[in-house]
Design a protein with these regions (language model features):
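Short, small-residue-biased leader/transition segments that mark boundaries at the very start
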Residues: 2-7, 178
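Catalytic cores of large soluble enzymes that bind and process phosphate-bearing ligands
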Residues: 6-11, 136, 140
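Amphipathic, soluble alpha/beta structural segments
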Residues: 35-41, 170-177
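Acidic, metal-coordinating catalytic segment for phosphate/diphosphate chemistry
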Residues: 100-173
Length: 178
């Protein structure tokens, strides 16, 4: 199997570095280059997503961000990685809002741009999202219950907050689901 790399959009680099180190992977980054001379819809428009990293050719990629709002930036990054001949692309995010619906993700999946999207159930997930072939729900209920129970017993939650083994297990599941 080809090696995987962790690729991150700008922001939250500490989390991406941690995950890359836990998984023993290389890491790269896309950052947004904006036009600060004008404002469109209350924001400075993105001119380009610039890439910092090594060759991704033939490698499986993990794109990490804290949340998927519309998802456009993550899908643009996925498309840019595919243009650079990346193999499979997995999108990891804590919160999947999908504010503009699921159509763009459906199309990206159908076009081979993304392979899987993983988010947690720490916010509401629509039944439509849960039925998507490309979607994996990361159920955090057990861990929230552990945290509440541990705090209720005045114990330390540090062992619960160390996700190394759980991260390894999820990645193994991704590779065995093919």
């Amino acid at each position: 199997s080809a090696a995987s790399d962790v690729y991150k959009r700008q922001g939250g680099m500490g989390r991406a570095i941690y995950i890359a180190n836990v998984l023993g992977l290389d890491m790269g980054m896309f950052y947004k280059r904006r036009d600060y001379t004008r404002i469109v819809n209350g924001r400075n428009p993105i001119v380009a997503h610039e890439f910092l990293g090594t060759s991704v050719e033939g490698k499986d990629m993990i794109i990490i961000d804290d949340m998927i709002s519309s998802g456009e930036s993550m899908l643009e990054v996925a498309a840019a990685l595919k243009e650079r001949k990346a193999n499979k692309i997995f999108v990891f995010s804590t919160f999947g809002l999908f504010t503009n619906g699921l159509d763009k993700f459906d199309k990206a999946y159908e076009n081979g741009i993304i392979d899987k999207v993983l988010t947690t159930n720490l916010i509401y997930q629509t039944p439509e999202l849960l039925q998507r072939e490309w979607y994996i729900n990361c159920d955090m209920s057990k861990y929230i219950a552990y945290i509440i129970d541990t705090l209720n017993h005045d114990s330390s939650i540090s062992d619960l907050l160390n996700p190394n083994e759980r991260i390894q297990n999820i990645v193994c599941l991704l590779y065995t689901s093919d």
